[in-house]
Amino acid sequence: MADTRPERRFTRIDRLPPYVFNITAELKMAARRRGEDIIDFSMGNPDGATPPHIVEKLCTVAQRPDTHGYSTSRGIPRLRRAISRWYQDRYDVEIDPESEAIVTIGSKEGLAHLMLATLDHGDTVLVPNPSYPIHIYGAVIAGAQVRSVPLVEGVDFFNELERAIRESYPKPKMMILGFPSNPTAQCVELEFFEKVVALAKRYDVLVVHDLAYADIVYDGWKAPSIMQVPGARDVAVEFFTLSKSYNMAGWRIGFMVGNKTLVSALARIKSYHDYGTFTPLQVAAIAALEGDQQCVRDIAEQYKRRRDVLVKGLHEAGWMVEMPKASMYVWAKIPEPYAAMGSLEFAKKLLNEAKVCVSPGIGFGDYGDTHVRFALIENRDRIRQAIRGIKAMFRADGLLPASSKHIHENAE
């Protein structure tokens, strides 16, 4: 007899919308099953090898029988001291390794657990739009309500941020930021964080900053840390992950520093949820942070070369995207002839007709629907192949004459 009982519903899960990236991922896999060669720019998943000295350290320490037990939720003391030295050497910022630093299982876990530890049902959280999905949905999962603050060209972000603080009820408890930005590659200077900290103190709002792309910077630019602002630790914490800087995405290790109360809150909830990450991974992370940083510069240089090929090729096709000065992404405004499609349908079109997979901007928030995101995870030959596919699509649509390399519509 068929089970006629209604399907169980789970309120926390029901608050999450369908994951838009799954749509393009499923279409990509279906195309590959049909034998189609899809150039994949969709996910920011580093394709390079982890530097050998880090792998060797992991293997060496993993041979020791005393490293296979439970670790500690805060992270081993040696790694926390290495984190403190990293901030001192890089930003001239003192971090107390005992009370102001905690190791996380990648930044995504740390962000989600921090929000679960500190947000109550009905709390208001301010998040730029567009933004990295965990910044939005970590708060939603924790039971908070998210108020979007437009982070788009032509809009004064701080005017919108202050208006959101004044007009929100209940008063916002937290704002979540990430620069250099995923997905937009937008960068800010230290003055931006000075204004954020001043605003946060004025209105008693906590600040969480995600510094995932601190090292993926180009053309001599350097990414500031919010912790460089005097008094930032009164209201702010900052996350860093080794995923991008050291090609360690699958290793799942990062850290959070800053406000002692927030560090303590994250440590408390992690003491219930986990025993920290595998000790040999933490020792390898020390080797990463304290070893020769030429490997980090080499990884950034590889992304720069890919960026240059992609942007040059898109410009040749008349798709006048902006040249990012940081991150591993190109945030591309949809060309005007396709603008009415929206980002999801345009991403489907690129997949079907150009054999190029990108992330639709709508997946990062409503204000992202005018753009698609390219992740620089394919080599330069594959990027050139993608450009040929995009040009072929433009030609088929009458936007690029067969005898010309350029289209002349306004794609800004």
Curated annotation (Swiss-Prot):
Known EC number: 2.6.1.2
Catalytic activity: L-alanine + 2-oxoglutarate = pyruvate + L-glutamate
Keyword list, A-Z: Amino-acid biosynthesis, Aminotransferase, Cytoplasm, Pyridoxal phosphate, Transferase
Modified residue annotations for N6-(pyridoxal phosphate)lysine: K244
Gene3D superfamilies reported in the protein's UniProt record: Aspartate Aminotransferase, domain 1 (3.90.1150.10), Type I PLP-dependent aspartate aminotransferase-like (Major domain) (3.40.640.10)
PANTHER family xrefs: AMINO ACID AMINOTRANSFERASE (PTHR42832), GLUTAMATE-PYRUVATE AMINOTRANSFERASE ALAC (PTHR42832:SF1)
Entry protein name: Glutamate-pyruvate aminotransferase AlaC
Gene that this sequence comes from: alaC
